[in-house]
């Protein structure tokens, strides 16, 4: 079992061999000090965000401990994520769904979206999709759609709205594309 230590809003896998295995198993996390890793041949600890940590913990791929060496439960990680990540429930629901469908999900912050989504993985391709997560009943300003569409078009990525709600609300994915009249 791979062991991680929860440090604030991140979990770190210090065992470098375990870090390489975990990264190779689905491009989870970021090797510390390596901005753009090419594959899993790196020699560094692996930093995981709370969404990744919770996902791996729920799937039995990771054990999480605090700094004193006490085991951290799924519920504790979830509570921490709910406290510090705005719209956590919606984001995690979409993150988990995309991962379960076989996609590699990374932060889309540098593109102004919630997620950048890969079919194969970073370093193998550019992310073909940007995903913005919203509540299904949330209003959106049409100008925001135009902005997001223009940005995604300028970086050659498809823009997807992921619309969902609390627990049992299904996720609806809307792919927005530019069309020429």
Curated annotation (Swiss-Prot):
<dbReference type="InterPro" id="IPR006676">
    <property type="entry name" value="tRNA_splic"/>
</dbReference>
<dbReference type="InterPro" id="IPR006677">
    <property type="entry name" value="tRNA_intron_Endonuc_cat-like"/>
</dbReference>
<dbReference type="InterPro" id="IPR006678">
    <property type="entry name" value="tRNA_intron_Endonuc_N"/>
</dbReference>
<dbReference type="GO" id="GO:0000213">
    <property type="term" value="F:tRNA-intron endonuclease activity"/>
</dbReference>
<dbReference type="GO" id="GO:0003676">
    <property type="term" value="F:nucleic acid binding"/>
</dbReference>
<dbReference type="Pfam" id="PF02778">
    <property type="entry name" value="tRNA_int_endo_N"/>
</dbReference>
<feature type="active site">
    <location>
        <position position="157"/>
    </location>
</feature>
<feature type="active site">
    <location>
        <position position="118"/>
    </location>
</feature>
<dbReference type="GO" id="GO:0016829">
    <property type="term" value="F:lyase activity"/>
</dbReference>
<dbReference type="InterPro" id="IPR036740">
    <property type="entry name" value="tRNA_intron_Endonuc_N_sf"/>
</dbReference>
<protein>
    <recommendedName>
        <fullName>tRNA-splicing endonuclease</fullName>
        <ecNumber>4.6.1.16</ecNumber>
    </recommendedName>
</protein>
<comment type="function">
    <text>Endonuclease that removes tRNA introns. Cleaves pre-tRNA at the 5'- and 3'-splice sites to release the intron. The products are an intron and two tRNA half-molecules bearing 2',3' cyclic phosphate and 5'-OH termini. Recognizes a pseudosymmetric substrate in which 2 bulged loops of 3 bases are separated by a stem of 4 bp.</text>
</comment>
<keyword id="KW-0819">tRNA processing</keyword>
<dbReference type="InterPro" id="IPR016442">
    <property type="entry name" value="tRNA_splic_arch_short"/>
</dbReference>
<keyword id="KW-0456">Lyase</keyword>
<dbReference type="GO" id="GO:0000379">
    <property type="term" value="P:tRNA-type intron splice site recognition and cleavage"/>
</dbReference>
<feature type="active site">
    <location>
        <position position="126"/>
    </location>
</feature>
<comment type="subunit">
    <text>Homotetramer; although the tetramer contains four active sites, only two participate in the cleavage. Therefore, it should be considered as a dimer of dimers.</text>
</comment>
<dbReference type="InterPro" id="IPR011856">
    <property type="entry name" value="tRNA_endonuc-like_dom_sf"/>
</dbReference>
<comment type="similarity">
    <text>Belongs to the tRNA-intron endonuclease family. Archaeal short subfamily.</text>
</comment>
<dbReference type="InterPro" id="IPR036167">
    <property type="entry name" value="tRNA_intron_Endo_cat-like_sf"/>
</dbReference>
<dbReference type="Pfam" id="PF01974">
    <property type="entry name" value="tRNA_int_endo"/>
</dbReference>
